């Protein structure tokens, strides 16, 4: 599944920002605009026992250029909240449910 970082009209958002995937399906986050973005999973809003640091980008790492990607595969079923750390205050947050 591909998730865009930044909408086509320049909005600071994940597109889609609420979605489901089967366990083990790769999710590819792709920078869609010229803004620096990243993908960080909220350690308090992921299934118990999942290490947020193993599925998140480092807060200092950024996808700076359009077309740059970050891929993650989630296997533990449940709900995961994630955000872009530079733009979390602007509402750039999302949720994925692993079935």
Curated annotation (Swiss-Prot):
Q: Which NCBIfam families match?
A: cyanin_plasto (TIGR02656)
Which cofactors does the annotated protein need, by name?
A: Cu(2+)
**Which InterPro entries does the record cross-reference, listed alphabetically?**
BlueCu_1, BlueCu_1_BS, Copper_blue_Plastocyanin, Cupredoxin, Plastocyanin
Q: Provide the topology term for how it sits in the membrane.
A: Peripheral membrane protein
PANTHER family to which the protein is assigned, alphabetical: PLASTOCYANIN MAJOR ISOFORM, CHLOROPLASTIC-RELATED
Q: Give all residue intervals belonging to the Plastocyanin-like domain.
A: 1-99
Listed binding positions for Cu cation are 37, 84, 87, 92
Family (UniProt):
Belongs to the plastocyanin family.
Keyword terms of this UniProt record: Chloroplast, Copper, Electron transport, Membrane, Metal-binding, Plastid, Thylakoid, Transport
Q: Which organism is it from?
A: Mercurialis perennis (Dog's mercury)
The protein depicted here goes by the name Plastocyanin
State any GO CC term.
Answer: chloroplast thylakoid lumen
């Amino acid at each position: 599944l591909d998730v865009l970082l930044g909408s086509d009209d320049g909005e600071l958002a994940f597109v889609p920002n609420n979605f489901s995937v089967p366990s083990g399906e790769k999710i590819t986050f792709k920078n869609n605009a010229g803004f620096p973005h990243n993908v960080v999973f909220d350690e308090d809003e992921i299934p118990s026992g999942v290490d947020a640091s193993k599925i998140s980008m480092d807060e200092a790492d950024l996808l700076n250029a359009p077309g740059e990607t970050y891929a993650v595969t989630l296997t533990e079923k449940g709900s995961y909240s994630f955000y872009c750390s530079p733009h979390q205050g602007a509402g750039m947050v999302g949720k994925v449910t692993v079935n």
